[in-house]
């Protein structure tokens, strides 16, 4: 799962700007904020696959590879790596495009993790995923 490829794996599901309010005590973007963006991006893909509501049930292998600077563009790429009866496993990579710090234009993978979502009905109970077709 953790590779230093130079090409993002998956589809772009979320793109946002790293802001000063999202920094940690060292001035880098807080890891929890990155994880939140990953969960949002992964949920978008999971909802498309499930045709409806999903909940996050687990995160595996969260790996922070490089820090993120304020003002840089944060891009979440997601790909489904496994489908169960009710669950969807999505690998999410965060790639950064440096637009506010040197070297301008550089792209790199900042973090990666596996997020597991479960499709749920209106009562919050697991429901089967639709048949792939």
Swiss-Prot record:
Known EC number: 3.1.2.-
Q: Return the GO cellular component terms, semicolon-separated.
A: cytoplasm; cytosol
Instruction: Supply the alphabetized keyword list.
Output: Hydrolase
- A Pfam family of the record is 4HBT
> What Gene3D superfamilies does its record include?
Hotdog Thioesterase
Q: Where does the record place the HotDog ACOT-type domain?
A: 8-123
> SUPFAM superfamilies this protein is in?
Thioesterase/thiol ester dehydrase-isomerase
GO annotation terms (biological process): acyl-CoA metabolic process; fatty acid catabolic process
Which superkingdom? Bacteria
Reply yes or no: does the keyword Hydrolase apply: yes
Q: Which CDD domains match?
A: BFIT_BACH
Gene Ontology molecular function: long-chain fatty acyl-CoA hydrolase activity
Matching PANTHER family, A to Z? Answer: ACYL COENZYME A THIOESTER HYDROLASE (PTHR11049), ACYL-COA THIOESTER HYDROLASE YCIA (PTHR11049:SF5)
Q: Quote the function comment for this protein.
A: Catalyzes the hydrolysis of the thioester bond in palmitoyl-CoA and malonyl-CoA.
Which family is it part of? Belongs to the acyl coenzyme A hydrolase family.
Q: Which NCBIfam families match?
A: PRK10694.1
What name does UniProt use for this protein?
Acyl-CoA thioester hydrolase YciA
Give the taxonomic lineage as stored in the record. Bacteria, Pseudomonadati, Pseudomonadota, Gammaproteobacteria, Enterobacterales
